[in-house]
């Protein structure tokens, strides 16, 4: 990343999982995004894609310009998700400032066996 910065990188996109586990960090993706933000500064856009069942933390929301979730599980929409992330990066660069970031945590857990978007309850026609 330091090498890319020296060459004039103007945006950073990370394809993350959203539920990584690290021995010395309670919030692995939040830690990674924070470290990247510290390296690139506030003026370079930082966007990440995550699984639709990611554990999104306040820290992740605070340091990333946008977090983009896959809409399918299994993840067959990787290209579309990357395209949405690229559009957000482009918009952030055009605006020259960070947009509002919001999230709302729903009060339930869904079993992994029920998360497939190919079958009910997660599938919708």
Kindly give the residue locations of the regions a language model identified.
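Short alpha-helical segments and helix-capping/turn motifs at coil-helix boundaries
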Residues: 1-2, 124
């Amino acid at each position: 990343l330091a090498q890319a910065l020296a060459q004039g990188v103007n945006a950073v996109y990370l394809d993350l999982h959203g539920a990584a586990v690290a021995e010395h960090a309670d919030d692995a993706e939040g830690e990674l995004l924070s470290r990247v933000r510290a390296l690139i500064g506030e003026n370079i856009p930082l966007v990440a894609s995550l699984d639709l069942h990611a554990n999104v933390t306040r820290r992740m929301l605070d340091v990333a310009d946008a977090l983009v979730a896959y809409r399918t599980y299994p993840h067959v929409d990787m290209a579309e998700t990357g395209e949405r992330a690229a559009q957000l990066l482009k918009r952030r660069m055009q605006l020259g400032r960070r947009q509002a970031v919001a999230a709302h945590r729903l009060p339930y857990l869904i079993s992994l066996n029920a998360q497939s978007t190919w079958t009910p309850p997660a599938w919708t026609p």
